[in-house]
Amino acid sequence: MSLIDQHNRLINYLRISVTDRCDLRCLYCMKENMTFLPKKEILTLEEIERLCDNFIDMGVKKIRLTGGEPLIRKDIIKLIKKLNSKKYSTNLNEITLTTNGSLLEKYAKNLKENGINRINVSLDTINSTKYNEITKFGNIDKVIKGIKESIKNNIQIKINTVVMKNFNENELEALILWTNNLNI
């Protein structure tokens, strides 16, 4: 059985949010005082794995784990390891991750060891003052260290930037030059 959308296109890519929680409060994403889903309403890692198995059986070849911030999910590496093992016995080819980067320094090596070869990092500015303003209490230095640690572990990084008028639209060239210097 294959998944086909209303335009008769084959669906082979699944994005799955593993948590609604995040360690940042980016202005355009979360309120400072968020109300999160009760834990009993969040899928367990086993349920997420079963869901992924069903989609893999229907032709999904790529799974992207997202959140909130997926790296704050307890035992996320165990899920990634289980999904990675499916690459050898199913049609699954790739597991990727979208993250704010705040925990990458801690997890980069484990992510690589468990089959993550590409990560999207949400980063709207490299100006520390603006970063603190947009994230409320984020630390740009941790994110940069995490990006560098990921690169050191041969993980490809893609930077996702939300361009906002009167905030960061004049920083795009600097951000591009910065990423080029990282050899992303």
Predicted regions and their residues:
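Residue-level signal for pocket-adjacent positions within structured domains
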Residues: S2, P38, I126-T129
